[in-house]
Amino acid sequence: MRLIRIGDISIARVWESSIRLPLSQLGPVDELIACHRDWLYPRFADLSDDMFEFNWQSWIIDVDGFVIVIDPCAGNGRERPAIQPLHRLDLPWLERFSATGYTPERVDAVFCTHLHCDHCGWNTRQIDGRWVPTFPNARYYFVDAEVRRWDPDAPGYREVDYNANVFDDSIRPVLEAGLAAIVPADHMIAPGVRIQPAHGHSDGHCVLRVDYRGTRLWFTGDAFHHPLQVSDTALNLGGDDDPALAIATRERLCSTIASEGSYFIPAHFAAPHAGRIIGAQEGRFRFVPLGY
Ligand SMILES: [Zn+2]
């Protein structure tokens, strides 16, 4: 699926790659599976083995002609030995990007929900051995707490193997080209388009809230990796800087999205990639896939 339509908003999807993961990697899920079979199969788990499709994909949104790219995937030619599916990729992501009808030159803004390797890779591409910004006319929005988290030269830097080399090949070249705007966690980038804090998965992880002609949606990055986390916010895939804060963030997002009646588009969900959240019994929430 290349285009998602929600209210007056069209969102183009640029797929990079996918893997299959076991639902059990999220934590104890047997009871939840029993309660949510009606929407879980076959899109969000395979009935034969309870594996789910985990996508790497980016979003392009056009708000009154202002074009924003959200979470530009992992990128080609990166040294990512700790994550083999992203190591030294050579994939036609840029060709798929152009197939949406948008060119990189047409992009006004790039927003990375956080600076993990799979959310900022295509910030840059390699030309003649140098990393250069992929979107030459865009302003790249980086949240200040997230830049502090991942700059290896920042005081107290905590290294993690899965994010080695990312700052040098995907962030620093954008800073040096003068295309970056380092902004607070609550920041408006265009009318109706606002960065909002959603910390926990990483120190400065944020989401993007869009409110356009009465349609409200949230690009929630890695606040959720699988829709079952809507019903049990303690489930997680690991790799959180602050797991307790990540849970609190999920709970807050669930109640906000449910009470607004808005849609959310996480970074990694399988088709239809987006959905709503409704209140369910005992203060729990329930995911409703787009189109249901
Ligand atoms: Zn991710």
Indicate residue ranges for each PLM-predicted region.
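Cap/insert and terminal regions of metallo-dependent hydrolase folds
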Residues: 84-95, 213-292
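Metal-dependent catalytic neighborhoods of phosphoester/phosphodiester hydrolases
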Residues: 120-130, 276-277
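Short, P/G- and charge-enriched loop/turn segments at secondary-structure junctions
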Residues: 44-49, 128-129, 195
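Metallo-beta-lactamase
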Residues: 1-102, 106-118, 134-197, 215-221, 245-261
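Active-site metal-binding loops of divalent metal-dependent hydrolases
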Residues: 16-17, 72-75, 115, 145-146, ...
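Short beta-strand scaffold segments in enzyme catalytic cores
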Residues: 57-61, 205-210
